[in-house]
Amino acid sequence: MQSYEPLLRAFSENHINYLIVGGVAVNLHGYPRFTNDLDILLTLDQENLKKMAELMDRMGYQQRLPVSIQELSDEQKARGFIEEKGLTAYSFIHDKYPQFNVDVLVAQSIDFEKFSKHTMRAEVWNIDVPVVSIDDLIAMKKNSDREKDIQDIVALLELKGL
């Protein structure tokens, strides 16, 4: 695996309901920068999470946490993981390709419907992929105080002409 291409193709072929966010979304909006993972939002219904878990397993990814991703389909449980355990992302790691980790942002996934209303579509490797809107991406990054997120906000605002 040389890129996220096989993963994005598999998401499409398996009808995973997701949105690309984070650094990859920044790139897809037109600001090239390095990122070492793929951040996504998922609909947290049981069927989508089951498909995701099975797909990631088939592709050689392991769940990083001692709980199944399917447990996030219970919104009360998901909020408990966030508030009591400090869970921000549910991570999948690949032993052979550690540079291609996948993080499911949990709190934002709870609000998937809100973010999906403004989705943009991008073509990557001849795959139609859903990407969070530039405005929603800026709003997500405003909740972080990491230097790279601040730089992303500046770059995204410049892309918008602001």
Set out the residue ranges of the language-model regions:
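Compositionally biased terminal segments of proteins
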Residues: 1-162
